[in-house]
């Protein structure tokens, strides 16, 4: 048996004693949302790290990227923190996007910015009525826990909750986990990049 399967089996065995509601009950509620002040116009400049604001989801690009207009009318492109959803051209990519559209289209959300990515998108936790949307995508088999980033930056308690949610979805064969070994989006992107003529 490969070395990685033993810890995975232990985690799945431990999760057998966890109810889905136990994972959901560990969803954190964001601090009181505060409007971003002092920024002019409808700038698409990302909000500073640690910023909290409230806004309406105006579009869902894919299973981990949305556009939000905050309460002051400023537009934000937001990448959901610590998850990686299948790309649109990949198996389950459309399902992941459509799930996020169903739960977020035209919804008001609380945004907790953690970083800005290399594309200038805010990287953030999103909450809708107290529900951690990022975690919900993992829990429902619509995204992976993006551990290569999360293990360096995500708070340990959140990391453990997200890892447990992914293991549960995997054990239940939910969403993208219905397939035995689904191709992770970071590997899909690497394959696409390698296949492009130089």
Locate each region found by the language model.
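Small beta-barrel nucleic-acid-binding modules, primarily SNase/OB-fold domains
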Residues: 1-198
């Amino acid at each position: 048996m490969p070395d990685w399967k033993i810890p995975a089996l232990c985690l799945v065995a431990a999760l057998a004693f966890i109810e889905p509601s136990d994972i959901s009950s560990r969803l954190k509620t964001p601090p009181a949302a505060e409007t971003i002040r002092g920024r002019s116009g409808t700038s698409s400049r990302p909000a500073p790290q640690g910023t909290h604001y409230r806004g309406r989801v105006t579009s869902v690009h894919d299973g981990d990227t949305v556009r939000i207009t905050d309460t002051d009318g400023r537009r934000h492109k937001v990448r959901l923190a610590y998850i990686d959803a299948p790309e649109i051209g990949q198996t389950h990519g459309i399902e992941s996007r459509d799930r996020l559209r169903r739960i977020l289209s035209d919804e008001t959300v609380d945004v907790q910015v953690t970083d800005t990515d290399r594309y200038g998108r805010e990287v953030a936790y999103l909450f809708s009525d107290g529900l951690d949307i990022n975690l919900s995508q993992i829990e429902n088999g619509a995204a992976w826990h993006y551990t290569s980033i999360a293990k360096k930056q995500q708070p340990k308690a959140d990391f453990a909750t997200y890892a447990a949610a992914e293991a549960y979805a995997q054990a239940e064969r939910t969403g993208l986990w219905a397939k035995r070994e689904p191709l992770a989006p970071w590997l899909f992107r690497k394959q696409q990049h390698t296949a492009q003529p130089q």
